[in-house]
Regions:
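Conserved, mostly hydrophobic/aromatic
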Residues: 8, 56, 81, 131, ...
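Active-site beta-loop-alpha junctions enriched in small/polar residues
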Residues: 11, 59-61, 94, 121, ...
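An N-cap/entry alpha-helix motif that binds or orients negatively charged groups
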Residues: 3-69
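C-terminal helical cap(s) of enzyme catalytic domains, especially alpha/beta-barrels
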Residues: 205-209, 232, 247-261
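Glycine-rich phosphate-binding active-site loops on the catalytic face of alpha/beta enzymes
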Residues: 133-150, 187-196, 236-254
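Catalytic cores of alpha/beta
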Residues: 123-134, 172-181, 218, 222-241
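N-terminal active-site wall of soluble small-molecule enzyme domains
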Residues: 58, 65-166, 172-177, 203-206
C-alpha cells in the first residue's frame, strides 16, 4: 500500500501538470474570486449530528478491490444517500486508481444540498482552489503525503476558502501532527498501509489520543450497525462508509439501518 501511495502521488503530479496547462493557478483563483465565500462550514456542522453522522461515499473503484460497481449512476447514488439521511457525501475525484472524476463532484454538487467532501490525494494548493470551484464543502488532507509545512498551509487555505478539512491519519505520530497544525476534524484510516488489512480498533485506540472537542471520523472497514455502535460508544463522531454502501442493492435501507440500529 505504501508503494501504491507513492504511485498515486506520482500520477497526481502528472495530473496537475496537465490541469495547469489547461487552466493556470491564477486563472483558477480568478474564477474562485467570483464565488461567494461563506464561513459557516456546513461540512463541519453536519458532522456534529448528535445521532449518527454518516459520510456516504461515491466510489467506483479502488486499488485494493478493483472495480466495485459497473452500474455507476453517480447522481442517483448521491440522491439516494441524501434521501436516506446521510450527513454528507464523499466523492472520489482521483481518476487512475479510483476511476473518479472532477465531473462527478461538480454534477453531484448541483443536485444535492448536503455538503460534499472532495476525496483525492491533495499535494498542491491548486487542488484546494479547484475543490472550491467544483462545489465541494470540504477536502481531504492526508498526513502521510504532506510535510507539516504543506499540511498547515493547505489547512489554512481551505479555511480561508470556507472549506472544512478532514486531516487523515493512520497512527499516533500522524495524530500528533494533525493536532499540532490545528486540525478541527481528524480522520483515521483503518486500513493498514503495509498489508491492506482493516481494523476499526485503530480508530478506537487513536481516539483516546485527542481531546473531545476534535471531530473524529472513522474511515474504512465499517460494515454493520454493530461497528457503528462500537465506534459511537468510543466517542467517534462520524463514519465514512464507501465500499459497503456501493455494493449494497438498497443503499437507503442500509443507511437507515446504520443510523438507527
Amino acid at each position: 500500500m505504501i508503494i501504491m501511495l507513492d504511485k498515486i502521488v506520482a500520477k497526481t503530479e502528472e495530473r496537475l501538470i496537465e490541469a495547469k496547462k489547461n487552466k493556470s493557478l491564477e486563472e483558477l483563483k480568478d474564477e474562485v474570486s467570483k464565488l461567494e465565500i461563506n464561513k459557516d462550514f456546513p461540512f463541519k456542522e453536519a458532522l456534529k449530528d448528535p445521532q449518527i453522522a454518516i459520510i456516504s461515499e461515491v466510489k467506483k473503484a479502488s486499488p485494493s478491490k478493483g472495480l466495485i460497481v459497473e452500474d455507476f449512476d453517480y447522481i442517483e447514488i448521491a440522491k439516494e444517500y441524501e434521501e436516506a439521511g446521510a450527513s454528507a457525501i464523499s466523492v472520489l475525484t482521483e481518476p487512475y486508481f479510483f476511476q473518479g472524476s472532477n465531473v462527478y463532484l461538480k454534477e453531484i454538487a448541483e443536485e444535492v444540498s448536503i455538503p460534499i467532501l472532495r476525496k483525492d490525494f491533495i499535494i498542491d494548493e491548486y487542488m484546494i482552489w479547484e475543490a472550491k470551484l467544483l462545489g465541494a464543502s470540504a477536502v481531504l488532507l492526508i498526513v502521510s503525503i504532506l510535510d507539516i509545512v504543506q499540511l498547515k498551509k493547505f489547512l489554512d487555505l481551505a479555511h480561508d476558502l470556507g472549506l472544512s478539512a478532514i486531516v487523515e491519519t493512520h497512527d499516533g505520530d500522524e495524530i500528533r501532527t494533525a493536532t499540532n497544525v490545528g486540525a478541527e476534524i481528524i480522520g483515521v484510516n483503518n486500513r493498514n498501509l503495509a498489508d491492506f488489512t482493516v481494523d476499526i480498533e485503530n480508530t478506537i485506540s487513536l481516539r483516546r489520543c485527542v481531546s473531545d472537542n476534535i471531530i473524529f471520523v472513522s474511515e474504512s472497514g465499517i460494515k454493520t450497525k454493530e461497528d457503528v455502535a462500537k465506534l459511537k460508544e468510543n466517542n467517534v463522531n462520524a463514519f465514512l462508509i464507501g465500499e459497503t454502501l456501493m455494493k449494497s442493492d438498497d443503499k437507503k435501507s442500509l443507511i437507515l439501518e446504520l443510523k438507527n440500529g
